[in-house]
Amino acid sequence: DMDNIPFTPPSKKIKSDYMWRDIERRAKFYGFEAKVPAPYPLTQFDLANQIAILGMNEGWGVKYVVKTYQRWFQQGKEPAVEPNLTEILEELNLDTSKIMERAQDPKINHQYIKNTEHAYKKGVFGSPSFIYKGEVFWGDDRLEDCIKWSKLN
């Protein structure tokens, strides 16, 4: 659901500029440079997410997600469009055509829908989100808060 896009409308330029700068700072905390603004909002994301689900089921999903985000935030390449999808899968030495076909299998799509519904029911509205005993913490900068909260409860 992309109805809650934080970087638009143009009337929110001050907030948008702040958010992109914050992403740059957070990236530096993790030891890499972010090329911002990155393509956003995304024009497509379902297939990329379905590929990630397939990959998580098969053990290569984390590598796929890391490469996807590196290309997005370090190279400015939108995650779910070609040739980016194919290039990522090739870098991982995966059979691109088979992965594309299997990622669109109704079982994977069903899992994608169920995962999304589960997230909504838990109160997740953005990424990254962390949940501890029903409490939602949204944003990379809230991970520490989630950990502190878990120690208090």
Regions found by a protein language model. Give the residues of each.
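Structural alpha/beta surface segment adjacent to cysteine/selenocysteine redox centers
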Residues: 1-72
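C-terminal cap of thioredoxin/glutaredoxin-like
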Residues: 67-153
